[in-house]
């Protein structure tokens, strides 16, 4: 199975930092699973937009097969689920540009190492 590189958006990382350590650890475990299983979680209308649920939370991520990357972009509770999904869909082009930039920066760091 293809191995993916998982990235977190700045807004996602800032939001996760507000949660207690238990929630942060669960997010880390989901991230670890995504490296080897891009189909982890539930599809949200397409195979490249998915969510993973635990307790009352949903983690949203975008899969970029052509880039070999997964981008974790949001967390929400059940009651904000549809609003969050709609917002992510509005910003798909922005997320694509952001992940491409992160990958370029990551590749530069790898070359310097």
For the regions a language model picked out, list residue spans one by one.
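Negatively charged, low-complexity tracts enriched in Asp/Glu with abundant Ser/Thr
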Residues: 2-45
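Enriched for short, Lys/Arg-rich terminal
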Residues: 2-5, 62-113
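Conserved short-loop catalytic and cofactor-binding motifs
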Residues: 15, 49, 76
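Short coil/turn residues that cap or connect secondary-structure elements
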Residues: 19, 53-56, 80
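A short, surface-exposed loop/turn module that caps and links secondary-structure elements
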Residues: 28-54, 99-108
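Short, well-ordered turn and helix-capping elements at secondary-structure junctions
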Residues: 38, 56-58, 76
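ATP/adenylate-binding site constellation spanning eukaryotic-like Ser/Thr protein kinases
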Residues: 46, 57, 66
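Short, surface-exposed charged micro-motifs
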Residues: 51, 58-62
């Amino acid at each position: 199975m293809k191995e993916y590189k998982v990235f977190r958006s700045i807004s996602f990382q800032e939001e996760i930092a507000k949660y207690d350590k238990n929630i942060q650890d669960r997010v880390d475990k989901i991230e670890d699973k995504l490296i080897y299983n891009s189909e982890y979680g539930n599809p949200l209308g397409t195979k490249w937009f998915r969510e993973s649920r635990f307790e009352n939370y949903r983690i949203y991520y975008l899969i970029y097969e052509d880039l070999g990357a997964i981008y974790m972009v949001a967390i929400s509770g059940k009651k904000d689920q549809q609003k969050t999904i709609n917002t992510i869909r509005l910003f798909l082009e922005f997320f694509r540009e952001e992940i491409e930039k992160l990958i370029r920066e990551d590749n530069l760091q790898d070359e310097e190492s």
